[in-house]
Amino acid sequence: MSASSLLSWHPRTIRRVVAAKDTGSEVVEAVTNAGAGFVKFLGNKEGPHILAAEFIGTLLAGEMGLPILDWHVFEYDGFPEIRLHSGSLAKAGSAWSTRKVEGFVWSGDVPIWRL
């Protein structure tokens, strides 16, 4: 997605949690005021550095002309309380969100260049 498309998606609040995923960042699938997405919060088991890595990696990919998903960083105020997969609560502060798009989950069984 182009940088201009990033300006059109601005989640600011979590309306409903769909699922807390068992991933390193403990991403949460959620419905936001801007639609369905995936949100990474402070308080995840990998620490805040994983959110910084996501931000930098996405910016670099965009600069290199690679396709990136729509994303937005917003301030999560701690409400509603969101329980991460590990059982801990998401902490208030910056949250990384990515718009949900339809696609498929790569199992890893087939080399990615054959997809």
Annotated model-derived regions:
Residues 2-110, 115:
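Conserved ATP-binding subdomain of kinase catalytic cores across diverse folds
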